[in-house]
């Protein structure tokens, strides 16, 4: 999320933030700068949030002046999921999706995801009426086609599935992911030295409406959430290796 997505007021996803020019560049743009300079970053996704009152998806300052002008980014910019819609509601800086599309592409957005509601047939009407320059369209198209050409997608548009198998679901990668996840836990409070759990404990009660709901526990940006999975369980509980029987009370009885 370029940029400032992690400092929204109250920690609210898609919220707003007020940040100084120096902090934006030295803290929030810094990881992107490293990726551009050291790794040749080819694509960037805009942040959902607004920065100092301006939604990033429609901000020429963020997507063109800073990202391209100051940071030297040469790739293409894609919208976060439905972020262009937010120019209409809730940010209310565009009256309709036609206006939102014009604002976004002029700001430096090249691709709208997940569907074309702003980048639609309406753009043709905007060009004919003089509200939008064809040069802006050509610029966005050129950026995308350049990446496709450099990746060889015109000659070979389909992935080599056999080659992919060498890199997917590797045991070493799974072990590293598990290690990273385990080390990321932060214990803020441990009353009566409850943790680590004693092996003498025979039963644990997990109480609340999210007790057995993977979607709620993992958040919306995870594979289980995408599939809208929930844990299968018996009415009287579920067996685990340790510490023993776990009893779910979803209704908080």
Go through each PLM region and give its residues.
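Glycoside hydrolase catalytic-domain context in secreted enzymes
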Residues: 1-253
């Amino acid at each position: 999320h370029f940029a400032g997505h992690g400092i929204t007021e109250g920690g609210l996803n898609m919220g707003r933030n007020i940040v100084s020019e120096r902090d934006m560049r030295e803290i929030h743009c810094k990881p992107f700068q490293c990726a551009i300079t050291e790794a040749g970053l080819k694509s960037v996704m805009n942040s959902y949030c607004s920065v100092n009152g301006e939604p990033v998806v429609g901000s020429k300052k963020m997507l063109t002046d800073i990202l391209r002008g100051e940071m030297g980014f040469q790739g293409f910019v894609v919208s976060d999921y439905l972020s262009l819609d937010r120019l209409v509601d809730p940010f209310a800086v565009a009256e309709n999706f036609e206006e939102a599309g014009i604002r976004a592409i002029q700001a430096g957005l090249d691709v709208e995801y997940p569907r074309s509601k702003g980048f639609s047939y309406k753009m043709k009407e905007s060009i004919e009426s003089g509200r939008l320059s064809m040069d802006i369209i050509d610029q966005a198209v050129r950026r995308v086609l350049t990446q496709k050409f450099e990746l060889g997608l015109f000659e070979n548009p389909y992935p080599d599935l056999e080659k992919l198998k060498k890199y997917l679901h590797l045991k070493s990668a799974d072990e590293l992911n598990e290690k990273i996840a385990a080390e990321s836990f932060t214990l803020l409070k441990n009353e009566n030295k409850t943790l680590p759990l004693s092996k003498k404990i025979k039963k644990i009660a997990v109480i609340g409406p999210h007790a057995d709901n993977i979607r709620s526990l993992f958040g919306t940006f995870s594979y289980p959430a995408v599939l809208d999975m929930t844990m299968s369980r018996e009415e009287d509980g579920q067996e685990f290796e340790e510490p023993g029987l776990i009893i779910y009370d979803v209704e908080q009885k």
